């Protein structure tokens, strides 16, 4: 058997053939039960196989057909990979890693099966405005201690509703007297190593007698600094236009009257949840790139919506799934976390997120092959109570101009494609160098969810 059966087929094929439990060293007639173990597509003549080497007489099949059938069976078996197999390749420096843009280009000439054979991990990324972001801080106790009930950092009111010296700095927190500066800027400045003014008040109790404190804080002086973002990395998002005669100032930026511009916010084919739209590899415990360091998916994001319609490529259109993310602020870089102010809207925070997608099977290889031309989203009129008035794909949006309702409309992204590409490349480099291994979710994302709305009791 050193060279395979009669030297006709390689040893690998021979070993595969002889390893099948239904085969024996003697005659090879198959029972009906044995026949049913083979998938559709196996040649029917296999039923009448005789002994090894028997000539093709009286309905029997020569051994060449037998081996071809076994080879076909081997090819029909679906190729899969496991997290451990991929991580072992990462540890050995042998993992093949591509960015989502690179694999989308590869998919122009390769089928998902070929991509699965060649690629182990695909890196995805986004860098956009994410208002539902913030940070938990613990300041430590003074002597005598204070139970902080009203807290300001650099003049910005932040939450005093936690424990005595804990707070949550929301990205959109701001001082009404200075609306262009807020929580997002505080978080960025702490990451940059700056000292900020902390002032707090309490009513005074027997165990916390102090009623006021004013001091300076930085990441070096406080205990914990944890970035905690309840809703980030939207799967998709509607394009914003304005059909009215006046300029609108929104979280989608400034919308000019009579549809003179269209604003969108997604990294398109680079976006994490567009490359794994059913969250097969993304769930509680998934390790990610977060603002320059390693962070984690800690839950589904708020407003997680599985009920959005799908286009012909299986891509959710509009505001669909989201992620809740957490990471250590002391390890982050303000290159990938920036405070921002949108005119006449308010403060927000740009957050850099990168998610690795392991190619476990052909379905995932197919999903990560998505291209901008295959990703549709709705056009929403912010001047008419959010009416959905059309749809467009990201290839059209990226061109800088779309034609809609007889008009040529200039398009501009709120998110940074440059930063998203940089994040995907950094994450790719981490994985290739063995500095970042993949984690399987310990809890999957929910399915079948939709959104509730508020009812106005005055109506």
PLM region spans:
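Anaerobic metallocofactor- and corrinoid-dependent redox/one-carbon enzyme cores
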Residues: 76-89, 94-459
